[in-house]
Amino acid sequence: MKVRAYCSSANLGVGFDVAAVALDAFYDEVEVYVKPGSGQIITEFYGPYSENIPLEDNTALLSARLLLTMSKVDVDVHIKVWKGIPLGLGLGGSGATAVATVKALSLELGLKIDDMKLALIAGLAEKAAAGSPHYDNVTASLLGGLIIIYSLNPLRALRFYPKGYFVLGVPHVKTPPRKTEVMRVIIPKTLSLEMLPPSLGRMAAFVSGLYTNSLELIGQSMTDDI
């Protein structure tokens, strides 16, 4: 079974950890092969961005392991990942790998798992690999379009298809290992009450712009002071 998952951009506007969009600029493609066994998982990476990916602590292996454990299925799995999304540049590359893996494996095994449960598993795999789950990235890659996470327990999301184009600027910079974990250390842990009303207003305008397909309103609401 072969599945493709596209890259994503998250933290749109004031939607920190809740708003993300799938983009067709880059993608990962995952093939899975299963046979009777005891749960052994082998991962193999190739493609333009396959260097320096650990064979043990990667989201393909971790997401497959979580899926097998939660589904109580004992099979051996061979996962081949064509890595077409650059890592460390904020494009949801590790999340896309996890998404393509759980989708391909669930289809190959004939498991009737809904997409939000698959997104949850992919997010948990990212947490194990990088220190924090990115439910916005993985949900966008899995569902497509622009999504807003509105519940974590259970995981739920709204999906939109805004009538516009996204221009993607990818910086050619070297990022540290576990970039997201490093960056989250410098994010403020507390906020002043005065910062809340403008952010809530912009989020309301953002959602309204998505429902009404107003690119002008969406653009006006993208400012984030936090």
PLM features: residue spans?
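Structural motif
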Residues: 1-2, 39-40, 77-78, 138-139, ...
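Short beta-strand segments
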Residues: 4-6, 22, 141-143, 150, ...
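Solvent-exposed alpha-helices and their adjacent loops that cap or buttress functional pockets
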Residues: 9-12, 21-24, 71, 130-133, ...
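Conserved active-site and cofactor/substrate-binding residues in soluble primary-metabolism enzymes
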Residues: 14, 25, 54-62, 92-100, ...
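C-terminal nucleotide
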Residues: 157-226
